[in-house]
């Protein structure tokens, strides 16, 4: 049977205040409170990252919507928070209570996703780097719940985000899911004592580090003994169309008098000017689904960029998902990169989540969306 700590809400209005006096006289953010209750946890389904599913558990003390629940596990997980700097974290899963029924069964939202809920990200931020976006998200001055920083593997999140949006802002949830899917990583949350021995505070950190700084692919196989289930997941929702008829307004006539240009999405996802295609048609969709688009020229007289049209007719990215029981002889951790053999086929991806119940310990493997054979 598991145990849990229950806290009042970690409201940034209170905790994001720098009036806590350190032994050296420096002022820091207020630390987290002591738990208001300690209880046992039964009838539970607890997801470690919660990127896809909501958790639930029955607690042996009364809880309210808005409370924070820290589930404690008799287990440690390894991380490498900097190159050559390894440590072990006690496995805890931190949630926001979003609903409670009459039997005191609580619906639990993973802390990270609850923290950024309702936050929007300006396009100016989405056009920068993955690090800049994450830094924007993990900021208690603007989001729903308190955090005190994060363990961050810069090698995993290196690079520039490629998030094409029409609106001036995008929901933080959508932006985060897109980045995490691209880099094959999901954040977790941990409550622990401050890193400095002279700092008496307990703090909450978001973990963006894996068990190895330089992740190496682990090859394994799963079979029927691990109760495997298979389905698919749409990791990027795009368009139901695969062919575009594009009219661009003539500046002289102020109307769409010029002949249209046609663009097509090939089976491999590339979008091309159809007039330049010289193939035999076998690499094009079996059924053409056309969409007519109308554009003005920009302030410099230029027509829309190909990237703009690509958003309108690129297919959704759909990948395979495998859910299976943990193998105690080769335990896998969330965010491990894995090549899995299942029923004679090799799937390449990562462990995106882990669910613990009273009866089993299961993993969610999600195939990489960058494979050439992905739908």
Swiss-Prot record:
Q: Which ranges of the sequence are coiled-coil?
A: none
GO CC, alphabetical: virus tail, baseplate
Q: Domain of life, per the record?
A: Viruses
Subcellular locations according to the entry: Virion
Q: Which UniProt keywords apply?
A: Viral baseplate protein, Viral genome ejection through host cell envelope, Viral long flexible tail ejection system, Viral penetration into host cytoplasm, Viral tail protein, Virion, Virus entry into host cell
Q: Which InterPro entries match?
A: Caud_bapl16_1st, Caud_bapl16_2nd, Caud_bapl16_3rd, Caud_bapl16_4th, Gp16_dom1_2, Gp16_domD4
Q: Does the keyword Amino-acid biosynthesis apply?
A: no
Record-level GO BP terms: symbiont genome ejection through host cell envelope, long flexible tail mechanism
Q: Which family does it belong to?
A: Belongs to the skunalikevirus baseplate protein gp16 family.
Quaternary state and partners of this protein? Answer: Homotrimer.
Q: What does this protein do?
A: Forms a dome thereby closing the central channel at the end of the baseplate. Changes its conformation upon activation by calcium allowing the channel to open at the bottom of the baseplate for DNA ejection.
The identity of this protein, by name, is Baseplate protein gp16
Species? Lactococcus phage SK1
The lineage, from the top, is: Viruses, Duplodnaviria, Heunggongvirae, Uroviricota, Caudoviricetes
């Amino acid at each position: 049977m598991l145990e849990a700590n229950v806290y009042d809400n970690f409201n940034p209005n209170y905790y994001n205040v720098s009036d806590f006096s350190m032994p050296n006289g420096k002022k820091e953010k207020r630390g987290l409170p002591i738990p208001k209750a300690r209880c046992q946890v039964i009838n539970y389904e607890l997801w470690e990252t919660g990127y896809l599913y909501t958790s639930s558990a029955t607690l042996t003390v009364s809880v309210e919507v808005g409370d924070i629940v820290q589930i404690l596990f008799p287990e440690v997980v390894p991380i490498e928070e900097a190159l050559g700097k390894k440590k072990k974290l006690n496995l805890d899963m931190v949630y926001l209570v979003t609903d409670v029924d009459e039997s005191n069964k609580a619906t639990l939202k993973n802390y990270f996703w609850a923290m950024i809920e309702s936050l929007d990200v300006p396009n100016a931020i989405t056009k920068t780097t993955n690090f800049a976006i994450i830094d924007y998200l993990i900021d208690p001055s603007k989001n729903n719940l308190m955090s005190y920083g994060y363990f961050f593997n810069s090698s995993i999140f290196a690079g520039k985000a490629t998030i094409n949006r029409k609106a001036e802002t995008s929901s933080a949830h959508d932006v985060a899911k897109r980045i995490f899917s691209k880099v094959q990583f999901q954040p977790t949350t941990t409550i622990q004592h401050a890193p400095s021995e002279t700092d008496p505070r307990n703090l909450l950190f978001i973990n963006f580090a894996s068990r190895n700084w330089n992740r190496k692919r682990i090859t394994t196989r799963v079979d029927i003994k691990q109760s495997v289930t298979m389905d698919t997941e749409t990791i990027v929702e795009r368009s139901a169309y695969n062919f575009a008829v594009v009219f661009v307004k003539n500046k002289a006539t102020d109307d769409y008098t010029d002949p249209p240009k046609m663009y097509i999405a090939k089976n491999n996802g590339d979008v091309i000017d159809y007039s330049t295609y010289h193939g035999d048609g076998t690499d094009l969709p079996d059924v053409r689904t056309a969409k007519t688009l109308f554009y003005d020229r920009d302030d410099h007289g230029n027509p829309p960029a190909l990237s703009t049209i690509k958003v309108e007719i690129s297919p959704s990215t759909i990948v395979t998902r495998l859910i299976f029981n943990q193998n105690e002889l080769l335990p896998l951790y969330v965010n491990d990169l894995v090549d899995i053999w299942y029923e004679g086929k090799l799937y390449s991806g990562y462990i995106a989540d882990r669910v613990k119940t009273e009866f089993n310990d299961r993993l969610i493997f999600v195939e990489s969306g960058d494979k050439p054979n992905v739908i």
